[in-house]
C-alpha cells in the first residue's frame, strides 16, 4: 500500500496532521495543536465523530479513543470530517505520512490528499461552504507542491466540483495543471478506490464482524443444546435399561 498525506483546508489556513495517538479506552478523544496540552474547541464534536453509536471511526477501526495533533488550529465548522475520516483509516493501516508544524509538504510525501467535506454515518459526502476561499488560501501550499515536484488530489463532494474546476481553469492557475487534480465523490469509500487503497477494507471488516457474530451464536447454541441432549440421552438410556431388567426378571426381589 502506498503512503499518503492528508491536508485539511480552512478559511484561515491549510492544516496538516502532525500525529495521531491511540489513547486508553476510557479517555475521550481530543484534538490539540503540536503536542500542546489544551484541547481545541472542536474536540467535543470530534468525540461524537469517533465514538459509537454516533461516530464512524470506532465502527471501522474498533478503537474509540485518539489524540490528534494538528499543525494549526481548526476552531469551527464541520468540513474537516472528510479529511479526518480518510486520515484515520489510512493511519489505521500505518500508511499516513505526518506533516510538521512549519512544513506541511515534506520530501518523502508522494501522495497528497486535499479534503473538504461533510460526511454522515453512511459515509455519504455533502457539500461545504467557502471552497473558493479555501482554494485561494491553499495557493502557497500548492506552490510548495510544485517546488517539490509533488502531486495533490483535491477530494470534494459532487456539488463542490464546479467551484474547484473554475479555480483550476483560471488562467492565473494554469501552472497547477500538471500537479493538482480534482475528483468528486458521493461516498468516502470511493476515495479509497480512487487512490488504489485496498478496495475491500470496509467489506472485509463487515464480513468478519458478521462471521464472528455467527460463530458466537453457534457456540452459544451448542453450549446450551449439548448438555440438554446429553441429559436426555442419559435419562433415556437409564429408562430403557430399567425396562430391560424388568422384562427379563433380572431385578432383585425381596
In which residue ranges do the predicted regions lie?
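Peripheral, non-AAA+ core regions of ATP-driven protein-machinery
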Residues: 1-251
Amino acid at each position: 500500500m502506498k503512503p499518503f498525506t492528508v491536508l485539511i483546508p480552512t478559511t484561515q489556513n491549510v492544516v496538516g496532521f502532525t500525529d495521531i495517538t491511540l489513547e486508553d479506552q476510557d479517555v475521550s478523544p481530543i484534538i490539540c495543536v503540536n503536542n500542546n496540552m489544551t484541547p481545541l474547541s472542536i474536540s467535543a464534536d470530534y468525540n461524537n465523530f469517533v465514538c459509537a453509536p454516533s461516530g464512524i471511526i470506532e465502527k471501522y477501526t474498533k478503537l474509540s479513543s485518539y489524540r490528534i495533533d494538528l499543525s494549526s488550529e481548526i476552531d469551527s465548522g464541520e468540513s474537516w470530517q472528510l479529511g479526518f475520516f480518510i486520515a484515520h483509516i489510512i493511519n489505521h493501516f500505518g500508511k499516513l505520512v505526518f506533516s510538521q508544524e512549519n512544513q506541511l509538504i515534506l520530501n518523502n510525501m508522494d501522495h497528497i490528499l486535499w479534503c473538504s467535506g461533510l460526511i454522515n454515518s453512511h459515509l455519504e459526502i455533502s457539500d461545504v461552504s467557502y471552497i473558493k476561499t479555501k482554494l485561494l488560501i491553499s495557493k502557497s501550499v500548492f506552490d510548495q507542491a510544485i517546488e517539490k515536484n509533488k502531486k495533490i488530489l483535491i477530494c470534494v463532494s459532487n456539488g463542490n466540483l464546479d467551484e474547484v474546476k473554475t479555480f483550476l481553469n483560471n488562467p492565473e492557475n494554469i501552472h497547477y495543471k500538471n500537479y493538482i487534480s480534482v475528483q468528486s465523490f458521493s461516498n468516502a469509500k470511493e476515495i479509497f478506490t480512487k487512490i488504489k487503497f485496498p478496495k475491500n477494507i470496509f467489506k472485509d471488516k463487515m464480513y468478519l464482524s458478521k462471521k464472528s457474530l455467527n460463530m458466537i451464536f453457534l457456540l452459544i447454541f451448542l453450549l446450551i443444546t449439548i448438555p440438554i441432549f446429553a441429559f436426555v440421552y442419559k435419562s433415556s438410556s437409564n429408562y430403557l435399561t430399567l425396562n430391560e431388567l424388568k422384562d427379563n426378571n433380572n431385578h432383585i426381589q425381596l
